[in-house]
């Protein structure tokens, strides 16, 4: 047993403060993304999640420019992006995609401008890499309270909205008949989504945060038979792949001394592998069920 622990955990892992911070912030972000992600997939708003993550990158870039907490920048722009989607408004799925694309383009334009100023006007030459791909081991411990507060806020919002959000995600027309204010619930979900992508962007970067939002949720919905179980499983998978990615990234410093691999790479790779495995398992389960039905 001790041999396995020594093999998996390189020296100093449990005593490293950057690792502690990464585990706390990354785990919290993954938990929130896993919960919110299930409803995002069920509502067919994966593109909106991707768009808000990219829009939030403008806030991350601006935060480096003016010297504030990057998470605040991500949050402000993600919330503004959600507000923009709701303000322009659209009822049909195709129109929602058009609105999302417009907001995405505007956000990326601002991100390009702010990153240009970061590189040319300040000394933050690594801002683009940090904003787009994350730097989990560089997250300061002082960010933990704000990250946890944002995560708790998003989880409380989902808990309060759970039943109407679930009903409106499965059948919007039935939800409206039963008195659910579908558009209000949809906007509140967008706000929770903005909080989730902001947290994931600060950990694995704006570009790759969609994998942490959509991947665990898609896997869970393939495996679980009930929405409640899917939410719990998605959160568990998200935390598992994030902590696993942190461990592998830390160990990678010993594979190629002085040149570790990014956490985001391992997180996305683990999500992809689990998604492929879940698809294979689902196909095998369907074949077995069809065979049993034929024999009956």
What does each model-found stretch correspond to?
Residues 1-30:
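Membrane-interfacial amphipathic/re-entrant helices at transmembrane-helix boundaries
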Residues 6-12, 17, 103-161:
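Transmembrane helix-bundle core of multi-pass membrane transporters
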Residues 23-28, 71-76, 98-102, 144-149, ...:
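Hydrophobic alpha-helical transmembrane segments
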Residues 26-34, 60, 82-83, 108-112, ...:
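Hydrophobic core segments of alpha-helical transmembrane domains in multi-pass membrane transport
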Residues 29, 143-216:
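Helix-loop-helix "hairpin" substructures at the membrane interface of multi-pass membrane proteins
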Residues 31, 35, 53-57, 79, ...:
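Hydrophobic alpha-helical segments embedded in the membrane of multi-pass proteins
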Residues 38-122, 220-235, 248, 252-256, ...:
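Short loop segments and helix-boundary regions at transmembrane helix junctions
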Residues 252, 259-296:
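Cytosolic-side transmembrane-helix boundaries in multi-pass membrane proteins
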């Amino acid at each position: 047993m001790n041999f396995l622990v020594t093999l998996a955990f390189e020296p100093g892992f449990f005593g490293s403060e950057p690792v502690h911070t990464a585990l706390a912030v990354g785990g919290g972000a993954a938990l929130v993304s896993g919960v919110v992600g299930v409803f995002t997939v069920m509502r067919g708003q994966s593109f909106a999640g991707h768009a808000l993550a990219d829009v939030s990158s403008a806030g991350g870039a601006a935060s480096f420019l003016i010297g504030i907490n990057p998470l605040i920048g991500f949050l402000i722009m993600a919330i503004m992006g959600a507000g923009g989607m709701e303000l322009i408004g659209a009822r049909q799925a195709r129109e929602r995609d058009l609105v999302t694309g417009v907001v995405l383009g505007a956000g990326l334009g601002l991100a390009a401008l702010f990153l240009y100023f970061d590189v040319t006007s300040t000394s933050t030459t690594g801002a683009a890499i940090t904003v787009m791909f994350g730097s989990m081991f560089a997250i300061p411990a002082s960010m933990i309270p704000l990250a946890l507060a944002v995560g708790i806020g998003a989880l409380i919002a989902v808990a309060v909205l759970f039943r109407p959000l679930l009903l409106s995600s499965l059948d919007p027309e039935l939800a409206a008949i039963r008195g659910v204010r579908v558009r209000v619930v949809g906007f509140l979900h967008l706000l929770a989504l903005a909080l989730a992508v902001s947290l994931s962007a600060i950990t694995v970067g704006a570009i790759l945060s969609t994998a942490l939002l959509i991947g665990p949720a898609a896997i869970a919905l393939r495996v679980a038979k009930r929405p409640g179980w899917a939410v719990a499983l998605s959160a568990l998978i998200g935390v598992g792949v994030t902590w696993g990615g942190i461990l592998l990234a830390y160990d990678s410093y010993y594979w190629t001394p002085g040149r570790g691999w990014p956490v985001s790479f391992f997180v996305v790779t683990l999500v992809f592998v689990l998604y492929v495995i879940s698809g294979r398992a689902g196909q095998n389960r369907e074949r077995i069920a069809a065979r049993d039905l034929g024999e009956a």
